[in-house]
Amino acid sequence: MATCTLRGLAVAGGGESSESEDDGWEIGYLDRAVQKLKGPLLPEEKNETFKKALTTGDISLVQELLDSGISVESSFRYGWTPLMYAASVSNVELVRVLLDRGANASFDKDKQTILITACSARGSEEQILKCVELLLSRNADPNVACRRLMTPIMYAARDGHPQVVALLVAHGAEVNSQDENGYTALTWAARQGHKNVVLKLLELGANKMLQTKDGKTPSEIAKRNKHLEIFNFLSLTLNPLEGKLQQLTKEETICKLLTTDSDKENDHLFSSYTAFGDLEIFLHGLGLEHMTDLLKERDITLRHLLTMRKDEFTKNGITSRDQQKILAALKELEVEEIKFGELPEVAKLEISGDEFLNFLLKLNKQCGHLITAVQNIITELPVNSHKIVLEWASPRNFTSVCEELVSNVEDLSKEVCKLKDLIQKLQNERENDPTHIPLMEEVSTWNSKILKRTAIAVCGVGLLLFVCKLTLQRK
């Protein structure tokens, strides 16, 4: 019966070019085509046999060849060593044997380290984790970067391995180091949509405000790549998760972070992520994950939670400490109201023109902010309802509020027009008053322009809200 062979090429890990880093190794799981050594081999034959033993994972033959005198640091095509190859295919036993025979865990080829190769290997996280742990136990440096300034933790985060990330940090990996483009491990995880890695990095002290070279934060990178759940989570102002595990010792961290569920199949460990709703994201951001089941059992939505009174918190079994966290978050989310009490009392005769002009300028600026806010909402609002990630209330509620907004803006527009007409009337009367000393022309023109701009801005707000209303009605 013919031997079935699966072949591929082992390439440099971690995003390095396969054209420049191809080591020419054929990999795959082959039937044991290589038998025990039957006699002395020429050096060329011995190297080829060693290479085949490595590709087939024949541990006993590898050991026999090493016993025969072949170097554990043999350099194959493009400078790869046996240990680098073993790490690239996550062969834990082979990595262990080679390390026990004296292989250098800190070897690198053109700044491509064995640890980077292990972190970017194609395999289950369980196998990658074990290989990385072996390399770290032999003093492999977790902060040595490749040519692109990417460190092992960035590769682990990019490929979605939260436990590998945790292990690297426990051994001293810098969680906030940046590559040549300014990407951190958190940025890579957000870019690739790995929610569990994002959460783990925040626990380990990742700074979510570090920007890339083009000025983007991890949340903006997540948004650009359509990972809206991660974007919403990273956009939360309050984040008690940050640095949660930084004060633990290495042993405590490893014990806490490397606990696995034995009931899960090895090939599917850590590979599936729980989808977060708006309630879960809010609670996780406050470190209140333990409340999730309680609130769901009582059918409490995020909207309901955010509008609860103190007696309702207690009635639903929410402790005082948890209440304080929720109320603190609500305080951060409050929108600063315009302090109309500070506006000038224009009825007083001693009010100066400068103060009144300042009032109009502030009002115009507020209108501009409102226009920008509505424009941003219209831009970001999904065109199709199936693209909405988080739970939304009935669109009728939004439409109703938009209708009230349009009505209020229309009323505001009418009042501003009345104000403009009144000021124009006062100006005309003063110009016709023979005892009045005319103001400078440019000042008059400037005041007129301000009033016109204010009126246009208010009308613009009304138009934008009307468009927003139509958009929501289509949904």
Curated annotation (Swiss-Prot):
Record flagged with keyword Transferase: no
Residues with PTM Phosphoserine: 17-18, 20
InterPro entries: Ankyrin_rpt (IPR002110), Ankyrin_rpt-contain_sf (IPR036770), Asz1_SAM (IPR042650), SAM (IPR001660), SAM/pointed_sf (IPR013761)
Cytoplasm listed as a keyword: yes
Database matches in Gene3D superfamilies: Ankyrin repeat-containing domain, Transcription Factor, Ets-1
CDD domains linked to this entry: SAM_ASZ1
Domain of life: Eukaryota
Annotated ranges, domain SAM: 272-334
GO cellular component term of the entry, any: pi-body
Alphabetized UniProt keyword annotations: ANK repeat, Cytoplasm, Developmental protein, Differentiation, Meiosis, Phosphoprotein, Repeat, RNA-mediated gene silencing, Spermatogenesis
GO biological process: cell differentiation; male meiotic nuclear division; regulatory ncRNA-mediated gene silencing; spermatogenesis; transposable element silencing
Cellular localisation: Cytoplasm
Main location class: cytoplasm
ANK repeat feature ranges: 45-74, 78-107, 110-144, 148-177, 181-210, 214-243
Biological role: Plays a central role during spermatogenesis by repressing transposable elements and preventing their mobilization, which is essential for the germline integrity. Acts via the piRNA metabolic process, which mediates the repression of transposable elements during meiosis by forming complexes composed of piRNAs and Piwi proteins and governs the methylation and subsequent repression of transposons. Its association with pi-bodies suggests a participation in the primary piRNAs metabolic process.
The protein's assembly and partners: Interacts with DDX4, PIWIL1, RANBP9 and TDRD1.
Protein name: Ankyrin repeat, SAM and basic leucine zipper domain-containing protein 1
Native source organism of the sequence: Mustela putorius furo
Gene: ASZ1
